[in-house]
Amino acid sequence: MAEDATLVDETALEAAAGESPPSNATACGELAPSPLLRGKWLKDDMPRERLLRQGPGVLSDTEMIVLILGSGLPGHDVFSVARELLDRFGSLRAMLDATYTDFDGLRGIGPAKKAQLLAIMEMARRSLVDKLRSRSLLNSPEAVENYLRLRIGGRPLEVFVSLFLDARHRLIHCEESAQGTLTRMAVYPREIVRRALSLNAASLIVAHNHPSGAVQPSASDCRLTHTLRDALTLIDVQLVDHLVVGVDSVYSFARAGWP
């Protein structure tokens, strides 16, 4: 679309996006009618202009992606590309877990657009980790849970994450200690113990996701938790918590009394 044009054809945008053109969206994604002028859009109602005037909270998820992409490719309008991205992943949060190959087959997403999206998503993840490093995680359980939901809550396969903490419960290092399938995963406590020693960690928070979304721990989750807790006790490292992570909720072994 031509940036210098004062008016943008509304019908063309609707056909390209498969939805109503960007409007006065709220942060919750609810749309309010856009000011129209004889079936056309004023330039002031385009996503970039509205963001600069009112802030990012007024934009829909589709419009945010439009601004990140900047433009489409020949034959692929940027609004339709943004909508297809959301349809593929289901939400912006799920996009944060995407890999390079997850974007394969999407119309209008070439190598440059893939790299751009992945770089922005990595910046978001690193920003969250930096926030965790600046505080005692023992006093910030919500921050830990929000980060883990964002990092692994939407993953299609099971992932086991270890957060190694210092004596003041500040984050030293976070890593994925194991990856599995849709329903099972092999975690080796001795490897986590070895890693804790190498990082000189004083305590540890571990977490894994349930791709099904149900966060109730299994019998094997409980066995692993107690085995790992006992192994860490032998080297004087505290297991602060084991979290089972879903897209929208988290189960805490510590809050549940270590069943």
UniProtKB/Swiss-Prot annotation:
Molecular function GO labels: metal ion binding; metallopeptidase activity
Similarity field: Belongs to the UPF0758 family.
Name of this chain's protein: UPF0758 protein Bphyt_3148
Keywords of the record: Hydrolase, Metal-binding, Metalloprotease, Protease, Zinc
Source domain of life: Bacteria
CDD domains assigned: MPN_DUF2466 (cd08071)
InterPro entries named among the record's database cross-references: MPN, RadC_JAB, RuvA_2-like, UPF0758, UPF0758_CS, UPF0758_N
Annotated Pfam families: RadC, UPF0758_N
Domain MPN positions: 137-259
Position of sequence motif JAMM motif: 208-221
